[in-house]
Structures are given as C-alpha cells and as structure tokens.
C-alpha cells in the first residue's frame, strides 16, 4: 500500500452527480473534501469581505495563497466554511458569481488557487470534486473516477430539482444549456473536460446513487490496496 496521502478524484460534466458522490465518499472513507467548482466563488467572497478589488491580481494572489476554507459533508449538504464562518448561502448569491467570473479570468490567481487546491492533500486522505482534478490538479492521484451521464438524463435531474423548488422550467431549455456547457468544457483550450487515461469511467445514466457509490468504493478500495 502506498505511503503517500490517498487522493480520490471525481471529474465529469455538470449534473452528472459528482457533488453527491464526493460527499458520500468523503463520509464513508473519512477523508477531507475539496469542491473545486466552489473555490473561485470562495475567493471572490473573501475578496468582498476584505474589500479587495476582484480585478487586481496583485491583491488577489496573496488572498488565494492563504485562503482559509473548508468543505464539510454534513447531512445531505456540503457546508463551506470561510475563515471559520459558514458561507454556503452567500456563495449562491449573484454578486458572488459575478465576482467569481472576474477572479477566474486572472492567470496568476488561477495558478495560486491551483497550489491552494493541492494543499488540501492532507491525511487521512482527500476526495476532490471537479472537472480537471485527475488531469491537471492531482495527476498522481491513486484513484481517479470520471462520472458521466447522458445530457438528457442530466437535464431530467435538473428539471426535477427545479420543479421541487416550485420553479417553472422547460426540459428543452435545460437540455440546450447543458449541451452548450458540455461543448464549452470539452473544447476549451486550457484543461478541457476529459477522463484521465487511468480513470474509471462510470456512466450513471441508468444507475441509482447507491449503485454509483458501491461501484466507486469497490474501485477505490482496490486501488488503495495496491
């Protein structure tokens, strides 16, 4: 068995169920959790809290380098703790999202956040959720999973989520949004969305979450025992 800190990466397109899978894996394995998709929003929120200009690389790089953030699986949710405060609700605000898109466009900030994400690799282990965790951030991870599902299934899941919240949405619109995002993610010049060569590809289209977790755990346990 490897003496290095075990890292499990879960990549895949939007709506495939990565967040739920990672939360459940982190709980079952007793590992730390990294939600890389939220990290730019967290940095943007830290900048807002500290009065830092979200377009200033010089000001943002030290903030990114020392970003004090934790992702904690609790119940059915992942709580985001920034500087000791639960900011899960604030992360979803439009203001935070707009600031995050500015932050994400700055190359030196991206580099600083890449190093900060790698610092999550601490004992007893890490489950990292994202789009390029296995191909860019943790290329040496012992267990890599690429979780996929058809665009139609992902649109159906999103439709149900939004309808459960009382929102009136059309399946065709959601499907179109998902297909456009897939196209952007898979064809972007930097870190395009693709499975790592050594990843287990899991298609969750016709699987329950319990089946996905069981398959993933079997694979992880076999890789960590090598």
UniProtKB/Swiss-Prot annotation:
Keywords: ATP-binding, Cytoplasm, Kinase, Nucleotide-binding, Transferase. GO terms for molecular function: ATP binding; CMP kinase activity; dCMP kinase activity. GO terms for cellular component: cytosol. Its main location: cytoplasm. It is found in: Cytoplasm. It catalyses: CMP + ATP = CDP + ADP; dCMP + ATP = dCDP + ADP. It comes from Vibrio campbellii (strain ATCC BAA-1116). Belongs to the cytidylate kinase family. Type 1 subfamily. One of its GO terms (biological process) is nucleobase-containing small molecule interconversion. This is Cytidylate kinase. ATP binds at residues 12-20. PANTHER family: CYTIDYLATE KINASE, CYTIDYLATE KINASE/PANTOATE-BETA-ALANINE LIGASE. InterPro entries: Cytidylate_kin (IPR003136), Cytidylate_kinase_dom (IPR011994), P-loop_NTPase (IPR027417). CDD domains: CMPK (cd02020). It holds the Pfam family Cytidylate_kin. Its EC number is 2.7.4.25. The lineage of its organism: Bacteria, Pseudomonadati, Pseudomonadota, Gammaproteobacteria, Vibrionales.
């Amino acid at each position: 068995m490897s003496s290095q800190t075990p890292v499990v990466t879960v990549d895949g397109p939007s709506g495939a169920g990565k967040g739920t899978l990672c939360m459940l894996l982190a709980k079952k394995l007793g590992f730390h959790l990294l939600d890389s998709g939220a990290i730019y929003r967290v940095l943007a929120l830290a900048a807002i809290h500290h009065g830092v200009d979200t377009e200033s690389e010089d000001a943002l790089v030290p903030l990114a380098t020392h970003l004090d953030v934790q992702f904690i699986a609790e119940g059915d949710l992942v709580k985001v703790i920034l500087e000791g405060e639960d900011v899960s609700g604030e992360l979803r605000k439009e203001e935070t999202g707009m600031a995050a898109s500015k932050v994400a466009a700055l190359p030196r900030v991206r580099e600083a956040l890449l190093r900060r994400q790698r610092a999550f690799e601490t004992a007893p282990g890490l489950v990292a959720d994202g789009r390029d965790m296995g191909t860019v951030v943790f290329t040496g991870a012992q267990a890599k999973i690429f979780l996929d599902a058809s665009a139609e299934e992902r649109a159906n899941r999103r439709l149900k989520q939004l309808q459960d919240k009382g929102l009136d949405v059309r399946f065709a619109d959601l499907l179109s949004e998902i297909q456009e995002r897939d196209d952007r993610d898979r064809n972007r010049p930097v870190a395009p969305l693709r499975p790592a060569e050594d990843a287990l590809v899991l298609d969750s289209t016709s699987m329950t979450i319990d089946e996905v977790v069981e398959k993933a755990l079997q694979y992880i346990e076999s890789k960590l025992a090598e």
